[in-house]
Structures are given as C-alpha cells and as structure tokens.
Amino acid sequence: MHTFGYRANALLTFAVTALAFICAIASFSDKFSNQNPSAEIQILNINRFKKQSHGNDEVSLTLDISADLQSLFTWNTKQVFVFVAAEYETPKNSLNQVSLWDAIIPAKEHAKFRIQVSNKYRFIDQGQNLRGKDFNLTLHWHVMPKTGKMFADKIVLPGYSLPDAYR
C-alpha cells in the first residue's frame, strides 16, 4: 500500500491541477463578453493657462466626464482602474501624455457615472508648446480580473484645443 505522504501528494497535485484548469477556463470565458463602453468628455472651463517661472506651460481645466463602463464588468472582474489623459504632439516628442484624472471603480453599480472635476494632476508641458495646441482627451481603463490576465483599452476623444494666449 502507499503511505500517507504519497496519497497526500497525489491529492494535492490533483487539486492544484484542477484549480489551474478552472482558472484558465475562467480567464478564457472573459473573451466572450460583449464589451461596449462609452464616454464623453467636455471641457467646461480653462481655469488657468500660464507660463511658469521656469518657462513651462501649465493648464488647469474643469472637465465634465460621463462614462458607461458597466459592460467591462463580468463575474470575473475585481475592479477597473480608469484615467483621463491629454495626448498631444510637440516638435521633440511624437506623443506626450499627461494624466489629468483617475479613479478605481470597485463594482458594476459605480461604473456608470458623470462627474465635474478640475484636473487632479497638473497639466504641465516641458516647454512652451501648449499655446494654440490641438490635443485629444483619452479615457483609458485597465480591467483587473479575479483570476487571469489583466487587459487595457481606451477611447480617444479628439478635437480639443487650447487658446493662443495665456490667461
């Protein structure tokens, strides 16, 4: 007969293999969910647009953010990290991204929202490149599952521009 150690090892090996298989199936099942998030962002006000003492441009905005991210939630979703970034080009860099606002959405009930907020983080360009600049506001999200691979996506909202003169 087999000893207790051999039997415990066989049972533990089977349990770990079964758990790994169930986790793989759970992760794979997220691929079949229909995800169609929507978002709209409006700039309500440019609170401040100035040149800092050391030469960099700084902007403070009031944003109206409305989004419906409920379709990102499945039975396997733990939480969703969401943030708004301003994206623009300068002569030195083909893509500049500045995070303006972020939040963690813990449940599907909180995934449909509308807020008016000033940018949480400072919108500063390393130089004097923001006057008259066209830029996109992009809503990024990272879905954090209970098990499986984390994934990210975004909605790009183009057509925003800053004034030609400081305020």
Swiss-Prot record:
One of its GO terms (cellular component) is plasmodesma. It is a single-pass type II membrane protein. Component of the signal peptidase complex (SPC) composed of a catalytic subunit SEC11 and three accessory subunits SPCS1, SPCS2 and SPCS3. The complex induces a local thinning of the ER membrane which is used to measure the length of the signal peptide (SP) h-region of protein substrates. This ensures the selectivity of the complex towards h-regions shorter than 18-20 amino acids. Residues 1-11 are cytoplasmic. Essential component of the signal peptidase complex (SPC) which catalyzes the cleavage of N-terminal signal sequences from nascent proteins as they are translocated into the lumen of the endoplasmic reticulum. Essential for the SPC catalytic activity, possibly by stabilizing and positioning the active center of the complex close to the lumenal surface. Keywords: Endoplasmic reticulum, Glycoprotein, Membrane, Signal-anchor, Transmembrane, Transmembrane helix. Belongs to the SPCS3 family. The chain crosses the membrane at residues 12-32. It is found in: Endoplasmic reticulum membrane. InterPro entries: SPC3. Glycans are attached at N136. Residues 33-167 are lumenal. GO terms for biological process: signal peptide processing. This is Signal peptidase complex subunit 3A. The lineage of its organism: Eukaryota, Viridiplantae, Streptophyta, Embryophyta, Tracheophyta.
